[in-house]
Amino acid sequence: MLISSRGRYALRVMIDLAEHNDGAYLPMKEVAQRQDISLKYLERILPILVSAKLIEGIHGKGGGYRLTKKPEEYRIRDILRLTEGDLAPVACLECGADACHRTAECRTLPLWVELNRRVNEYLDSVTIADLMR
């Protein structure tokens, strides 16, 4: 499991919106400058977050983006699954994966199952509020 730039940037954007949350919409340009992320890249990430209703956005004068919930209500796992897809460490544990023909004899499967469980459990336990500290 390697978290892509999209996943890392999505977390940075969510933290930025949380840290500057006064109820107003924050212009994308300001977020991009503070986070040193290109506007072009943000234009690909923000719609994903909006469509999942993690943030809301308004176009035009006075527009921008803001959180839809309190920072402590956003679990990191949800954001990363949205931007990364399945977080399984190996293909045979991905959601909807066909059963591997070696499952019955695979000596490493218990390792991957436990790693997957621990990673997901940890990411479920961390919120945006935790990352603001």
Give the predicted meaning of each segment:
Residues 46-47:
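Short, hydrophobic-biased segments on the C-terminal half of alpha helices
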Residues 68-133:
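Non-DNA-binding regulatory cores of transcription-related proteins
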